[in-house]
Amino acid sequence: MVDIVTRVNNVVNGFVWGPFGLALLFCTGLWLSVRTGFFQFRRMGYWLRHTIGAIFTNKDVTAHTSKEDMAISQFQSMCTALAGTIGTGNIVGVATAIVSGGPGAIFWMWVMALLGMMTSFAENVLGVYYRRKNEKGEWNGGAMYYLTDGLGAKPGCKAVGRVLAVLFACFCILASFGIGNMSQINSIAGNMNAAFHLPYLATGLALMAVTALIVIGGLKRVAAVTEKLVPLMALFYVAGALIIVVMHAGNIPAALAAIFKGAFNLNAAGGGALGYGISQTITWGFKRGAFSNEAGLGSAVMVNSASNVKEPVHQGMWGVFEVFADTMVVCTLTALVILTTGVVELESGAVLAGVQDNALVGRAFTAAFGSFGPKFIAVSILLFAYSTTLGWSHYGTKAVEYLFGTAGSRIYKVVFVCMTVVGATMKLGLAWDLSDTFNGLMMIPNLIGVLALSGTVVDITRNYFARRVRGEDIEPMWSAFEEYQKEEEAEAAAEEAELDKAANK
């Protein structure tokens, strides 16, 4: 039975993460970039000012919502989304890309990220535009909703939209237990055992207790943790990586040359048939790029849609920044650490004798930090992997709620918490492979919806810049539903009246 499941999984995985799936992901990002006039480059200063820049200049971005308001702040939604995307893939995944595809894979990882910025932008614009409130007053958004109410509203597409939404939700639930929970916890337990000799079961029980306290408390509690955890873990890892890169600054030109030269090298990584190398390089770069930032998978949309933002484009810009931070910053630093410390051969990506790709980053940190290196990586993986678990707990919760309502989501949370112990104590080879496939299967229905609704994304974006930049007096496109549109307009009018009142005092 296991052999049959393995063979079927290999076929499906080869489809979703093979040439078809990666080409679909690439072409979607390219199409959206063209349709928006390459927004990610042309408006780079604008989206940086309204995301990371706004954290320091606009208190509304970081201010917590009231107890009665079930939404979370823009900063909290960004941190929770990054919690879900910044994981072990940013450490081990980058090493795998270099070993399997050579240093040139990093170039193609960048390409996928640069195009993926607009896929993430479109997902989040649609997520906010088609979101709905549940009986508790929480915003529910994501691919399930823009497939049902967006694609499903097109002539003859009602059944198609609904079926794709159900498939997406099912794949998301299955992926949340694997790549969003057990695989991450297993990675934590293994590294804590290797670095600090902690028993696997002890790690699992400790993480189960902490997860129960956070996850069962709902999104607001998850967001309250991630808004502190994500900046901390990012600063911790980035600081350590920067120290190593600066220590080996003289090797940076050679590392960058290897990346750009290797991107178009016909020889395979580690040797191989002529012409096969560039195919492997592109494939591994694209695959690891997609894994690291999840643009196109539709996962982070579910938490970004819970933001207290009114403008869909504002949340879309946060999506652009999330991909930028995940891949262009964190993954790039990991790559430079590997390529500047001499643990791989720059021409081929071949590793030092006796070193496996999953230990490559640890070897690089050990070369720089000595015996502290493995401990640094163990703590980094603890923070990265556990934050991923918190983010995915919300994704799975919302997928279950879409299918079974809020009662079902409560049961899901209990099961999710219990699975942390399973993840810490079991060997998960097949489980990892299956969850990887389910993660990819989420991408197909999501990208169908994003492509079908790309015109809506363009219309919303043009409406935003017409009002906010050119000052045109036109009705905003905030929601696809009249009741929420009027509600948002009433809130905006009240806020404007308060500002006028304060200005006249």
PLM regions and their residue ranges:
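Alpha-helical membrane segments and immediately flanking helix-loop junctions
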Residues: K59-I98, L126-Y129, E135-L151, I173, ...
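Transmembrane helix-loop junctions in multi-pass membrane proteins
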Residues: I4-V5, R35-Q40, N90-V94, S176-A189, ...
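Membrane-interface loop-to-helix entry segments
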Residues: L24-R49, L164, F168, I185-M192, ...
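Helix-loop-helix module between adjacent transmembrane segments
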Residues: L32-S33, M112-G137, T148-N186, G190-I214, ...
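Extracellular/periplasmic helix-exit of transmembrane alpha-helices
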Residues: E123-K136, L242-A258, L266, G270-A273, ...
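N-terminal alpha-helical transmembrane segments of multi-pass membrane transport
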Residues: M1-G84, T88, V99-A105, G116, ...
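Flexible loop linkers connecting adjacent transmembrane helices
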Residues: F38-I72, T96-I106, W110, M118-A159, ...
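Membrane-interface alpha-helices at helix entry/exit sites of multi-pass transporters
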Residues: K67-A71, G102-V111, D149, A153-V166, ...
